[in-house]
Amino acid sequence: MQSAILGFGMSIPSLRIKTEEIANTWKQDANAMINGLGVTEKTVPDAGEDTFTLAFEAGRQAIEIADIQSSQVSAVFVGSESHPYAVKPTSGMVAAALECDPFCHCADLEFACKAGTAAIQIVDSMIRAKQISHGLAIGADCAQAKPGDALEYTAAAGAAAFIMGPATAKNALCRIDQTLSFTTDTPDFWRANGKAHPEHAGRFTGEPAYFHHVREATKGILEIGSIKPEEIDHVIFHMPNAKFPSRVAKEFGFTKEQMEHGFIVPTVGNTYSACSPLGLAHVLQQAKKDDRILLVSYGSGAGSDAFLMTMMKDGVKLAPDTRETTYVNYTEYQSLIAAH
């Protein structure tokens, strides 16, 4: 039995900081940073927002779109590298807050920026095995970066959630056709226990890390799916910046039109575990029945999860976010980040 996405949701903070503001603070060339990264601004979590609150809001919306009772959900997996507690599961908090079935499989997942897609794979497997009828997979993060580090320009906050169930369900929106993972031991990015900020290996994060893993996962999923790039309608690659996914897409022959709906990084930033899942959530609003979707995540350390999906009906528009976008200065930004 195949699984499908029945509903989806997302939560993105309304606060932003512009790339120019960060660059000016550190006396760097703002235009060079914008052109180099392809990111003009990023989300900033407010004082009352964290990985749990973002995950909860996205999950609540996903249940609403799926048009099911939260008590039907018997598995909740939350992928993140910024869980609020070192010991106290975000997944259990989310399951309780959403009033899911208390006989619920719950776990917090970590694999850098691909923990959210790992959650999707686990729920997909449980549904295929007929162990559960409905599960909730969430990717959520309030990403950290050392002040003055290159990561500060992109490390952002957000969450995406997916209610999954049998592909035979009347409310099935998008079927999961195939999935695979490609994993190695590649030390491109890490945060040691007890450390406040992650470290990274600079340019090493590119070719032997992101590009190698995303290429291999993409080649593998296209091969097992017996599908060519031109037969894909929508493609989402992990977006640590705008340049990396654009480059790998060009290598495979994907067009800007195939990427446009899920390419959110220029004005959102890299939301880590929520990054490619948020791209998918945007695509699920625009895609049409029978459209084919390719999703490839990347998590440092390192690995990529790849998915082929098929839309079973036209996409569903989420309610518009009516909050006003507010831009903060660097001092305000650092104060908010310190609160997390």
Protein language model regions, located:
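Buried hydrophobic positions in well-ordered alpha/beta secondary-structure cores of metabolic enzymes
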Residues: I5-G7, M33, A62, V76, ...
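A structural motif shared across PLP-dependent enzymes of the aminotransferase-like
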Residues: E21-Q28, T53, S82-M93
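Phosphate/pyrophosphate-binding loops at sites that engage ATP/ADP/AMP, CoA/4′-phosphopantetheine
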Residues: A58-S74, R215-D233, F252, A287
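Short beta-strand segments
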Residues: G9, G79, G135-D141, M164, ...
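Condensing-enzyme catalytic core mediating Claisen C-C bond formation in acyl metabolism
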Residues: M1-G48, D149-P208, H212, E216-K219, ...
